[in-house]
Curated annotation (Swiss-Prot):
Substitution effect: residue 115 to A: Impairs interaction with CNOT7. Inhibits CNOT7 mRNA deadenylase activity
UniProt entry tagged with the keyword Phosphoprotein: yes
Family: Belongs to the BTG family.
Effect in UniProt of substituting residue 75 to A: Abolishes interaction with CNOT7 and CNOT8
Substitution effect: residue 147 to A: Impairs phosphorylation by MAPK1 and MAPK3, and decreases PIN1-binding
Protein's recorded name: Protein BTG2
Parts forming coiled coils: none
Superkingdom of the source species: Eukaryota
Length: 158
């Protein structure tokens, strides 16, 4: 069940927007005022785009839909928002990597530049279940366990 509330995904969207804005900022071709408008518009666009595709109880569900992708072709959401601040397609292609994948999922935002690049995590938060004492595989590794606890079933036969 999707929560449908924009506030549930604000940290993840803020991380994605901040990352994309920083990529535009590094070239120095976009003014801070235009970046501010871009960031606000992108935050709104992503919140609207993801609102029925956000599943905190199953973070990987809908991941492909939420993925922001530039593969020599500009992601349509980035393209639309950039046009609001007067950035053309050729300008966008000069400012952003030619290959970028940005995954915006509940509890984690990560990216990869290039097809063979390493995946880097921008934002990570423990799911609510993990913070309530339930051990996930990842949490067990962090706690130093080499494998999950084993449950044994004893059967008695006569």
């Amino acid at each position: 069940m999707s929560h449908g509330k924009g506030t549930d995904m604000l940290p993840e969207i803020a991380a994605a927007v901040g990352f994309l804005s920083s990529l535009l900022r590094t070239r120095g071709c976009v003014s801070e005022q235009r970046l501010k408008v871009f960031s606000g518009a992108l935050q709104e666009a992503l919140t609207e785009h993801y609102k029925h595709h956000w599943f905190p109880e199953k973070p990987s569900k809908g991941s492909g839909y939420r993925c922001i992708r530039i593969n020599h072709k500009m992601d349509p959401i980035i393209s639309r928002v950039a046009s609001q601040i007067g950035l053309s397609q050729p300008q966008l292609h000069q400012l952003l990597p030619s290959e970028l994948t940005l995954w915006v999922d509940p509890y984690e935002v990560s990216y990869r530049i290039g097809e063979d690049g390493s995946i880097c995590v921008l934002y990570e938060e423990a799911p609510l279940a993990a913070s309530c004492g339930l051990l996930t595989c990842k949490n067990q590794v962090l706690l130093g366990r080499s494998s999950p606890s084993k449950n044994y079933v004893m059967a008695v036969s006569s």
